Amino acid sequence: PIHDQAGKNLDNLADAVYKVLEELAISEYILCAHSLSGILACKLLKKPIKCQALVAIEPTTKNVMFADFSENPYPEMEEQMRLIEECGPELYFKNLTQETFSPETNKEIWKIMQEKRSELENQDSGFQISGEITEEDFENVSIESHVPVFIFCQAYREKEYRESEYWTSNTKLILGGNHHYLQWSESEKIATIILELSE
C-alpha cells in the first residue's frame, strides 16, 4: 500500500531503504535510480553497505530542482513541460507508453496505474504522496570516485550533468532518448550495463 509521507524527508527515506537492505542481508548492490530518487541514491551511497555502481536515469540535479527558468531558459525541457500541460499528464504518459511498449504491457501498466489512483483517491485529505525535498537535501552531496556512475540522459542535459553533484572521475554519460522516462525507451542499454556490472 501507499503510505502517507507527511513529515518525512529524504533522510528518513534513505534510512528506510537502508534498513530493508540490512534486513535482507545484502552485502553489495547495484543502485538504479530515476529522477528525484537520484538525490536519494547519493544519500544511500554514504551508508556502510557497499554499492557496486550507480545507474542513474535523468537524476534530478540541484540546478534544475531550484532553477529560475525565466533567467536561465532550458528550451528543450520547457517544450516537454508545454506538451504535458497541453495534453494533460495522463494523455502525455499514455502516448509515451504506447510508443514504447507492446499493447499487452501497455494495458498492464495502465491497469496498475488505475489501481494506484483508486488507492490514492480513498486516502484522507492531507495525504502526502511524497516526502519533502528542500535545498538542504542537496547540501554536502557528493559521490566517492571509486563508485562507478552511469548517467542516462537526453543529449541537451550533458553540460548540466558534467557540472552536477553526480560527476566524478568515474562517471560515464550515456546520451539518448527524447523524454525524461529513459527507463522505457533505453531499457535494453540500461539492462546491458546492469548485467555487465553483475558479472
Question: Where does each model-flagged region fall?
Answer:
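Accessory cap/linker subdomain of secreted extracellular hydrolases
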Residues: 75-111
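Conserved hydrolase catalytic core segment
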Residues: 27-68
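Catalytic histidine-centered segment of alpha/beta-hydrolase-like enzymes
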Residues: 178-187
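Active-site loop/oxyanion-hole signature of alpha/beta-hydrolase fold enzymes
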Residues: 1-30
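Conserved serine/cysteine hydrolase catalytic core
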Residues: 102-177
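Flexible "cap/lid" loop of the alpha/beta hydrolase fold
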Residues: 55-87
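Short, hydrophobic alpha-helix immediately C-terminal to the catalytic nucleophile
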Residues: 18, 42-46, 191-195
